Amino acid sequence: MGSIFRRAEQYLDRIDDGAFIEIGSSRAGDDGSTNVIAAWADQRNKQLVTVDFDPAVCTALRGQTLSNVEIVNSNGEDYLRSTKGPISFLYLDNFDWDWHPLNTEDFVLEQQARYKQLGRTMTNLTSQMAHLNQAILAMPSMTLRSLIVCDDTWYNEHWGHYSGKSGAAVPYLIGQGYRILETEEYPTYGTILGRW
């Protein structure tokens, strides 16, 4: 999990009026993105919509006191297909990235097993496919001046391409007029794109 999303706050005054959407809600022990982004939205008299396909994650979030958060139990693609927009802030943080696919870490194996229970397959390829589809589905609802944050996604200087969860989505977003504001591998693992 990356923490670059925290740097997105400095760009929020540049975006149009629109919804704040998080695809992939916070889980116990992670970076706390849902609470942080909810606070940003609240400061702007907005609501955060956080979307997660795991009902247990949604139930845990509903147990917290998050007055300005709508919790939606859905996969990101279905939610974005049905939303009418406008969206000015989008955080793509669902699935997870297997940093060591030849020697997968235990926490990733646990997530892969949970995804399988819920009828989905979690691999690096399915993660990239999901994020690309979400970027495509979100585009008609994105405001002209908007921000998209991609978790666990960075520019790989050695290979000359974007790697990670949204590695396939970043070139598409650049083609839609977004520009890279920040991208970093270690230690924050993420990419922030803006269009204005």
What residue spans do the PLM features occupy?
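A short alpha-helical cap/connector motif
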Residues: M1-W196
